[in-house]
C-alpha cells in the first residue's frame, strides 16, 4: 500500500475513508469531490414526494444518522467539508436556490462532468436535481441514474431508487492505495515545474528526442522520490 494526498491522486481513484469506499471525481481549490463507490441503500428521495432536495427526507438522513455513522469511524479530526449545493433544476429554474450540506447527492451537472470516471451501479440511484419545480407544475419528479449510466427521472416518494452519497473532502487528506494503482500522472503544478527545469537546462530546445526523454525521465524520477519522502514524513 502507498499513501498519497488526495490532491495528488488521479480522477477515478478508489479509496477508503470513514468506513466507506469512495471514488475521487475532481479536485478544486483544496476540495476533493468524492462519490460513494456503491449504493448504500434504497430509500425515497423524499417521503413526502417533494423534489426539492433542500427539504427532502434523504438530505436529512444523509446529514443526520448517516453522517454520524461516518464520523464514528474517523480517527481524529475529520476531513468532511460543508458546501453550498446548487439546486438549479434540469430545465434551468432556480426556485429551489441552494442548500448547505456535508453529505449530498450529486447534481446533474456534477454527474455529467465526471461521467467518465463514475462506474455504473447495480441499481437506480438518485441525483439531487429536480426535473422542474412546483411553480412549473412538477413538484415531485427528481432526476436519477439508471444501471447503464443514462439519466432518467422518478417520483420522489419512490423507495426503489438508491442513495449514492457524495461529499467534499479536504484534498490534503492522505489516502492509501495499492502500489500498482499509484499514478505517475503529473499535476499541472508539477508539469510546470518540470517544463521550467527542462527549459532552464536546455535553453528551451532539445538536440534529440532521446535527450528530451532522458531529461524528462530524470525529472519524473526525482518527483516520485520527493513524493515518497513527503509521505514518509507526514
Question: How would you describe each model-predicted region?
Answer:
Residues 1, 227-234:
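Short intrinsically disordered terminal tails
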Residues 1-189:
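Collagenous Gly-X-Y triple-helix signature in extracellular proteins
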Residues 10, 149-150, 195, 214, ...:
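N-terminal secretory targeting and juxtamembrane "stalk" segments of secreted and cell-surface proteins
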Residues 173, 220-230:
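C-terminal alpha-helix/helix-terminus motif
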Residues 186-203:
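N-terminal acidic leader/helix
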Residues 190-193, 209-224:
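Alpha-helical segments embedded in low-complexity/disordered contexts
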Residues 202-210:
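Charged, low-complexity interaction regions
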Amino acid at each position: 500500500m502507498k499513501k498519497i494526498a488526495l490532491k495528488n491522486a488521479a480522477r477515478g481513484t478508489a479509496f477508503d475513508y470513514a468506513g466507506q469506499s469512495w471514488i475521487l471525481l475532481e479536485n478544486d481549490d483544496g476540495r476533493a469531490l468524492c462519490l460513494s463507490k456503491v449504493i448504500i441503500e434504497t430509500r425515497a428521495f423524499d417521503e413526502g414526494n417533494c423534489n426539492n432536495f433542500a427539504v427532502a427526507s434523504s438530505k436529512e438522513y444523509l446529514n443526520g444518522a448517516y453522517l454520524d455513522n461516518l464520523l464514528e469511524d474517523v480517527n481524529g479530526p475529520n476531513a468532511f467539508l460543508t458546501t453550498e449545493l446548487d439546486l438549479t433544476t434540469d430545465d434551468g429554474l432556480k426556485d429551489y436556490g441552494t442548500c448547505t450540506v456535508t453529505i449530498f447527492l450529486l447534481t446533474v451537472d456534477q454527474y455529467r462532468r465526471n461521467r467518465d470516471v463514475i462506474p455504473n451501479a447495480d441499481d437506480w440511484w438518485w441525483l439531487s436535481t429536480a426535473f422542474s419545480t412546483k411553480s412549473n407544475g412538477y413538484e415531485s419528479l427528481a432526476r436519477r441514474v439508471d444501471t447503464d449510466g443514462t439519466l432518467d427521472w422518478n417520483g420522489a416518494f419512490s423507495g426503489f431508487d438508491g442513495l449514492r452519497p457524495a461529499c467534499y473532502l479536504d484534498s490534503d487528506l492522505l489516502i492509501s492505495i495499492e502500489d500498482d494503482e499509484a499514478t505517475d500522472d503529473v499535476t499541472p503544478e508539477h508539469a510546470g515545474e518540470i517544463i521550467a527545469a527542462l527549459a532552464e537546462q536546455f535553453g528551451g530546445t532539445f538536440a534529440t528526442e532521446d535527450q528530451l526523454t532522458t531529461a524528462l525521465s530524470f525529472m519524473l524520477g526525482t518527483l516520485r522520490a520527493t513524493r515518497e519522502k513527503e509521505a514518509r514524513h507526514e
